Amino acid sequence: MAQKVEAQGGKGANLWDDGSTHDAVTKIQLAAGIDGIQYVQFDYVKNGQPEQAPLRGTKGRVLPADPFVINHPDEHLVSVEGWYSPEGIIQGIKFISNKKTSDVIGSDEGTHFTLQVKDKKIIGFHGSAGGNLNSLGAYFAPLTTTTPLTPAKQLTAFGSDDGTVWDDGAYVGVKKVYVGQAQDGISAVKFVYDKSPEEVTGEEHGKSTLLGFEEFVLDYPSEYITAVDGTYDKIFGSDGSVITMLRFKTNKQTSPPFGLEAGTVFELKEEGHKIVGFHGRADVLLHKIGVHVRPLSN
C-alpha cells in the first residue's frame, strides 16, 4: 500500500491525481513562466510497461526545462523540494534521486516544502493546477519490494558435455547480451542482469577473440527475452559439439543471428515465461547453453 503525502502549495484550481499503483517515476518534464511553474508532466513504469500521465497545468509559450530522466530500475526518485508564493502558485521545484539532483527549475523564493519519506521512493504524484501548477503531493512505496519473486525454473541445456559447467543463476531480468565469435563457432557469451536495485554483469563464459563481442541491448524493463534458438555441431578434431549460432527473441523483436547456422537446431523456451538467467558449459568455445525462466507475472 502506497503512502500518500498531502499536496503542498495553494488550495485552488483543479485537483489531479496520477495514481499510486506505478512501479516508479521514469521522467519529469516541466516549464517555468513569469508567475511560476506553468506545467508538469510525469512518465511512469507500471507492470514493466511505460505510461505517460496527462500534462498538469497549461503549456503556453514558455520553453520547457531539460527533462529529468530517472534510469529505472537502478535509479529511483527520493524526494522533491519546492517553493510556493502567497498566491498559492508553485514557484520552483527541485528533484532528487538516489544518484543525482536536478537544478532548481523556476525560482527558490517563497514558502519552502519537501516531499520525502525515509527509506521510501516516489511512485506517483497528485496536486492541483489551472493556468499554473498550484500544489504538488506524492505517493511513496518501500524501496524493496515485499512481493517475492516466483522461484525460477531451469530448462535443459543444449550442446555437448565438453568444457566446464557454468551457471549465472536467476535474476529479475536480462538487460544486455554479448556474443563473441570464432572460426569454429561461438567463442564466448556474457550477460548483464537486473538484480533490483543493482545491475549485475555476469562472467565471460568461453574465451573472447580479437573480434571482441557483438552486443544485443534490450529496451529494459518493457522488453524481455522470451526464447533463444540456435544450432550446435561437431567440429574437426573434437568429439564434442560447439554452439555455432545463437538468436534471441523478445516480446518486441528478434535479434540477428550470432554465428553461422550449422548442425542440430534447438530452442530454449517456456510458454508464459521470460528468460532471467543462463547456464551451460564452455572452455575456449561455448559448448552448451541453457536458461532459467520465471512466469511473466514477475
Swiss-Prot record:
It is found in: Cytoplasm. It comes from Arabidopsis thaliana (Mouse-ear cress). Belongs to the jacalin lectin family. CDD domains: Jacalin. One of its GO terms (molecular function) is enzyme regulator activity. The modification Phosphoserine is found at S20. This is PYK10-binding protein 1. PROSITE patterns: JACALIN_LECTIN (PS51752). Expressed exclusively in roots. Component of the PYK10 complex, at least composed of PYK10/BGLU23, BGLU21, BGLU22, JAL22, JAL23, PBP1/JAL30, PBP2/JAL31, JAL32, JAL33, JAL34, JAL35, GLL22 and GLL23. Inhibitor-type lectin that may regulate the correct polymerization of BGLU23/PYK10 upon tissue damage. Activates BGLU21, BGLU22 and BGLU23.
